[in-house]
Amino acid sequence: MFSIVVPVYNVEKYLHKCVKSILSQCYENFEVILVDDGSTDRSPEICDEFALSDSRCRVIHQPNKGLSGARNSGLNEANGIYILFIDSDDEIAPNLLNCLEINFNKYNVDIIGFNAVVNDIKGQCILSTGKNVGMVEDGIKIVQKRIPVSTVPLYCYKNEFLRKTNIIFKDGIYYEDVLFTAQIFMTNPKVFFLDETFYYYNKREESITTSKIKMKNYCDIVSICSELLDYEVVNDFAFENAYRNIIMSYIMLSEEIYRGMSMEDRKKGKINRRILMNNVKQRKSRVGILNYFVAEFPSLFYTVREIRRKIR
């Protein structure tokens, strides 16, 4: 059985489409855990309506704890063998669960990843996550190869595996799934990537990803980078290489966010930027010489990376 956790907060415009895409699965053995995170619109009533009309749906009503708190609440209540986290303004393809079960049985892995498309507010596709490779990989090797580690909704996890890691979503921050996914992959799970698109991100004007980047976004990604810098590094070449790649990718992410800020916020953020770069440089032996120079010249390395992307 699958447990599908859907954090819900003030999404009355989008919730019907999201849940209906789940209930329309051709595979029927699943539960939907709708976590109403203190919504102030009609979302709580909509959740209750789904629970009354379909026995596969159940609702958790809780005071607002943020996205991490909602996901953690759903995770605690999940009874399924497999767990998915679906954002309440997005949709999934009708054959997702069926395909996941077939491949979990075939490959006996801990995690299965899949592709997504991003639709704008008019429903037009503006981005695809690209092609995943249909093969089994170790989590450490995936990070070693610099294969992009996607956000939480693009993976299905074995419940037993997640319980053993004791990793949960960190409360009170943006980009909490960035930290969660990095921590999960550093436990070296067996991962299979499906080269198919099953997830549909729907951008909306008021969402975090489309609103003006604010100071808190940047401070949170700096906090995540700092937490990863304190991660215990095992004396193993593959692990060290993967760890350094993760540090590199999140330094670059912090630089990308920094560049998206207003000039006024950049001035405020310079202190945090300097603290992060100093933390990296102080851990030169752990993070490697390349990350040391990235911390010394973040703008230069970011520009080079963007040029290389365009050439490709």
Place the predicted regions along the sequence by residue.
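Donor-binding/catalytic cores of nucleotide-activated saccharide
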Residues: 67-68, 88-192, 202-215, 233
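Short aromatic/hydrophobic "clamp" motif used to bind/position activated sugar donors
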Residues: 83
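Cell-envelope/extracellular polymer assembly enzymes that use nucleotide-activated donors
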Residues: 1-3, 21, 31, 179
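Short, well-formed alpha-helical segments that are part of the catalytic scaffolds
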Residues: 10-24
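Catalytic core of nucleotide-sugar-dependent glycosyltransferases
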Residues: 198-204, 211-237, 253-280
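Membrane-interface aromatic/basic loop that binds lipid-linked glycans or pyrophosphate carriers
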Residues: 259-312
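A conserved acidic beta->alpha catalytic loop
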Residues: 21, 36-45, 63, 87
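Glycine-rich, basic loop-to-helix element that forms the pyrophosphate-binding segment
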Residues: 62-78
